[in-house]
């Protein structure tokens, strides 16, 4: 540091020793400039900080995509700077955030979900506040958020992560395990007090009786569901329906059934969670997936089952019908045992035991612009996820689906995305659609990801 300051001082002396500068001028103005420039030079010297071997990596949350709904939780993206005119340094509004942006949060987030223009975050904390919401709230899918100007009114847009109140009996003992979001409703899964639902219940998707002409805007209503044969271990919101998986491996559903997405053998609405039968009868299910109107389920022995909408060939391997109202076993050759499934609006994906990703349906499926539709799964080349002869151990460990895009996490902590890049939802720095997996760069290691319609949220760990 001293050497840098000495060099800076010598350079300064040479500049000030020119004609017209006397000794008094050097003493008064030159000395202050010398100190200032020496300080600036010292500040430019890189500082190396060493991290201990036992230092904990910090939790991070990154968001990107369309911001004007408030779903990204960054108010400055939505609200213009206050004041009569532009201020120096004021940030302009940002309609689209095309690359990952770090969301400043004090809480350790364990689950995230993206709805149609809104976001839920949850933590397994023992604190009273366990869930935070942001974004569109016209159906109270984020709960009631009281207006600061009028205490009797609530916000229809929540621009920053705000606490969601849950009617917990034992708030310091109960933990929130997972959140899920649909088009205008939300589910919150707890470990001790069942499942809570909020938002639009026009089709019974919140698991309660449909009330004619019910007003959902600025509603305080949070419904609790506990009438399951077993403990619910996973929830999944479709567009206007809900799925519940219990620790007994059984699947329950409620909500809109016009495409058969409730899987209950009819096409009507169902306002109370009801157990599915069909080919799922007696099957031990370990995961359910839905987001649009098609549903998939994975069994413990690696089997795959599907029901609901099949207009885009999602279930064309077993039926010509475009609506399937009971679960059907999908016998796909060459896929192997299925570990995970993801289901969007028109496309589906599964991950097998070898870490390979298979896609089918309609749209941008991930194998280039020539593959537009397929009734049977097509494997995406593992090399597109980073597999090489120098990195032979790389494989995909987790898959997710938004309405029209996909995401995959690898065992090396890398996130790949592909599909329709609606309002920059892929986070790849440009707005064009992506026809094959592309790695998303961010200052952290992704551990989980949530996909919406036009935005995404990633939970990550700091590198050091």
UniProtKB/Swiss-Prot annotation:
Its GO CC terms are: mitochondrial inner membrane; mitochondrial matrix; mitochondrial membrane; mitochondrion
**Subcellular location(s) of the protein:** Mitochondrion membrane
Subunit info here reads: Forms a regulatory protein-RNA complex, consisting of RCC1L, NGRN, RPUSD3, RPUSD4, TRUB2, FASTKD2 and 16S mt-rRNA. Interacts with 16S mt-rRNA; this interaction is direct. Interacts with OPA1; this interaction is direct.
Q: Which PROSITE patterns match?
A: RCC1_2 (PS00626), RCC1_3 (PS50012)
Q: What is the role of this chain?
A: Guanine nucleotide exchange factor (GEF) for mitochondrial dynamin-related GTPase OPA1. Activates OPA1, by exchanging bound GDP for free GTP, and drives OPA1 and MFN1-dependent mitochondrial fusion. Plays an essential role in mitochondrial ribosome biogenesis. As a component of a functional protein-RNA module, consisting of RCC1L, NGRN, RPUSD3, RPUSD4, TRUB2, FASTKD2 and 16S mitochondrial ribosomal RNA (16S mt-rRNA), controls 16S mt-rRNA abundance and is required for intra-mitochondrial translation of core subunits of the oxidative phosphorylation system.
Q: Which InterPro entries match?
A: Mitochondrial_GEF_domain, RCC1/BLIP-II, Reg_chr_condens
Which SUPFAM superfamilies does the entry mention? Answer: RCC1/BLIP-II (SSF50985)
Gene expressing this chain: RCC1L
- The main location is mitochondrion
Which tissues is this chain's protein expressed in?
Ubiquitous.
Which PANTHER family does this UniProt record tie to the protein?
RCC1-LIKE G EXCHANGING FACTOR-LIKE PROTEIN
Biological process, per Gene Ontology: mitochondrial fusion; mitochondrial large ribosomal subunit assembly; mitochondrial small ribosomal subunit assembly; positive regulation of mitochondrial translation
Q: Which GO terms describe its molecular function?
A: GTP binding; guanyl-nucleotide exchange factor activity; RNA binding; rRNA binding
Q: Which UniProt keywords apply?
A: GTP-binding, Guanine-nucleotide releasing factor, Membrane, Mitochondrion, Mitochondrion inner membrane, Nucleotide-binding, Repeat, RNA-binding, rRNA-binding, Transit peptide, Williams-Beuren syndrome
- The RCC1 repeat ranges on this chain: 58-124, 128-191, 193-247, 248-300, 302-353, 354-411, 412-461
Transit peptide endpoints, chain numbering: 1-37
Name of this chain's protein: RCC1-like G exchanging factor-like protein
For this protein, the record's Pfam families field holds: RCC1, WD40_RLD
* Disease linked to the protein: WBSCR16 is located in the Williams-Beuren syndrome (WBS) critical region. WBS results from a hemizygous deletion of several genes on chromosome 7q11.23, thought to arise as a consequence of unequal crossing over between highly homologous low-copy repeat sequences flanking the deleted region. Haploinsufficiency of WBSCR16 may be the cause of certain cardiovascular and musculo-skeletal abnormalities observed in the disease.
Does Iron-sulfur show up as a keyword for this record? Answer: no
User: In its keyword annotation, does this UniProt entry include rRNA-binding?
Assistant: yes
For domains, the record's comment is: The RCC1-like repeats assemble into a circular seven-bladed beta propeller structure. Each blade is composed of four antiparallel beta-strands with loops between each strand.
